[in-house]
Swiss-Prot record:
It comes from the Bacteria. It catalyses: tRNA(Phe) + L-phenylalanine + ATP = L-phenylalanyl-tRNA(Phe) + AMP + diphosphate + H(+). GO terms for molecular function: ATP binding; magnesium ion binding; phenylalanine-tRNA ligase activity; tRNA binding. This is Phenylalanine--tRNA ligase alpha subunit. Transmembrane segments: none annotated. It is found in: Cytoplasm. One of its GO terms (biological process) is phenylalanyl-tRNA aminoacylation. GO terms for cellular component: cytoplasm. Belongs to the class-II aminoacyl-tRNA synthetase family. Phe-tRNA synthetase alpha subunit type 1 subfamily. Its EC number is 6.1.1.20. InterPro entries: aa-tRNA-synth_II (IPR006195), aa-tRNA-synth_II/BPL/LPL (IPR045864), Phe-tRNA-synth_IIc_asu (IPR004529), Phe-tRNA_ligase_II_N (IPR004188), Phe_tRNA_ligase_alpha1_bac (IPR022911), Phenylalanyl-tRNA_Synthase (IPR002319), tRNA-bd_arm (IPR010978). Its cofactor is Mg(2+). Pfam families: Phe_tRNA-synt_N, tRNA-synt_2d. The gene is pheS.
Amino acid sequence: MTKIDFENIKILQDKIKDIEIEKNVYDERNIFLKNYLSPLYKELKEMSEEDKKEFGKQLNQYKEMIEDVAEKRINEIKKQKILNIKSEYDINLPADYFQSGGINPIDLVKNEIVKFFKKANFKILTESEVTSVEFNFDSLNIKKDHPARSISDTFYIDDKQLLRVHNTAITSKALRMFNKEEEIKVLSHGNVYRKDDDDATHSHQFNQIDMVWVKKGMSLANLKWLTDKLLKYLFNESIKIRYRISHFPFTEPSFEVDINCFFCDSKDHCSVCKNTKWIEVLGAGLLHPNVLKNANVKKGLSGIAFGIGIDRIAMLKYQIKDIRRLYGNDFSLIESFKGER
């Protein structure tokens, strides 16, 4: 088994130590990753399962060290910029005390999920909130007469453009973008829009995460493993998880995934789960063959996918009963998350 030379990170340190522009630091980091890390991933694919476990751990450690070196230099550049400003201006004049808030629960959950998938080497994508009918509907096997296409459900800009109704629109574009690769691992996040009346549990704008993982031999076992791992990471290891058969045009088979309700243990009536003892948290499934075909993905590959409403997860994790509080600049709510990251 190849031994990783952790000492060669000094090469990157020497390259970036005198750089004064943040973008140039990232450029040097990317070159280093291509020259030193990418070849190791190719070697990993050829190893036995036993060797892969140990070598994979070393690879992740190596990658984190590379990222840390780059981020350290970036922080030094930012700090120097502040010092330069201080030398030109007197920024120490007295000012009124401003009470600070904290990070919005939506961002807290999003950051948790992104961190989870970054560790699994997923590409993290965001796109314009305006997308095409093709990527939002056509390429995702959504029929012309599907109710979601109706102007009563979707915010159209013109005949060909709209505000995306799900982040699967980014996924469909990513599948086409990376269709020459043997493995595609993509996570997208951002706002989505639907013509819902705003109330305690609905909003015309909300945040969504969409995941797709394509490679040879992907199955329901992979989907269940990844979904279970994510939900236990977000909530706790003891939660119960249930899969129900459902239908989505872009997956086959499709499932809705529930977790056991942790609000109603001591209540006669639970307003969260309506006494069903279960709470729906995401939709998932195997990518429909037509979706892969429309993206010209290599033959012989299969994929798993799921979509998660970030707002819903935030409401469950932090026991927020009205979704409007997440968007209403409610300082008392945001202040309670001071110190969270």
